[in-house]
Amino acid sequence: MTKPIVVTGTDTGIGKTVFAAALAGALDAFYWKPVQAGIEDETDRQAVLRLSGLPDARLLPEAYRLNTPASPHLAAEIDGVTIDAEALALPEIDGPLVVEGAGGLLVPLTRAITYIDIFARWRAPVVLCARTTLGTINHTLLSIEALRARAIPLLGVAFIGDENVESERVIVQIGRVPRLGRLPRLVEVTADALRAAFAQNFNTDDFLKDPAS
């Protein structure tokens, strides 16, 4: 039976893929990125393969691989590809599955459908990755509100970056959401360093609990 966890973020470039790699490795899970936009450099799937310690067979192929590094809706239009967002379904996997979105919740897959629309249909529990720098309180609380408005189950917030006790505390208090932990900035991002940092700062049992309401 598939046990999916959706990893999304408050913004792009905050370390969501690195976190997804750490989580997938810690849970000995499968990993899936439904849409990859931009394949010239290392793709997210390739990064997770490098950092998670998982065998290649655990990393499922993307539903769409787009050449252009842009929002999926625009990348698809430039590449001449039609994304059938309504047909995107969670793979049938026997065991845990980490699914990574792109950027934030309202990143468009098409001109009519955003990632949060897909997450609402899937009803899979979500981990919200948030940075710790200036502006994160507003971005994170808005993302929490958006998830709750669509009745999407939220496991909690995973902070990424340098310690910011006050911002983290305010988000947890006002957002009424569990703090899952904080992945610190790593001097060198390797599989071993990431595995150790995740084990020190997160409890894998927290990702297997029933989501907060």
Curated annotation (Swiss-Prot):
Essential cofactor(s): Mg(2+)
Residue numbers annotated as active site: 33
Pathway this chain belongs to: Cofactor biosynthesis; biotin biosynthesis; biotin from 7,8-diaminononanoate: step 1/2
Gene Ontology BP terms: biotin biosynthetic process
GO molecular function, one term: dethiobiotin synthase activity
Annotated positions binding ATP: 13-18, 100-103, 184-186
Annotated InterPro entries: DTB_synth_BioD, P-loop_NTPase
Residues annotated as transmembrane: none
Origin superkingdom: Bacteria
Swiss-Prot/TrEMBL catalytic activity: (7R,8S)-7,8-diammoniononanoate + CO2 + ATP = (4R,5S)-dethiobiotin + ADP + phosphate + 3 H(+)
EC number: 6.3.3.3
GO CC terms in record: cytosol
Protein location: Cytoplasm
Keyword set, alphabetical order: ATP-binding, Biotin biosynthesis, Cytoplasm, Ligase, Magnesium, Metal-binding, Nucleotide-binding
Enzyme class name: ligase
Positions that bind Mg(2+): 17, 100
Protein family (similarity comment): Belongs to the dethiobiotin synthetase family.
Subunit: Homodimer.
NCBIfam families: bioD (TIGR00347)
Function of the protein: Catalyzes a mechanistically unusual reaction, the ATP-dependent insertion of CO2 between the N7 and N8 nitrogen atoms of 7,8-diaminopelargonic acid (DAPA, also called 7,8-diammoniononanoate) to form a ureido ring.
Protein name as annotated: ATP-dependent dethiobiotin synthetase BioD
Source organism of the structure: Rhodopseudomonas palustris (strain HaA2)
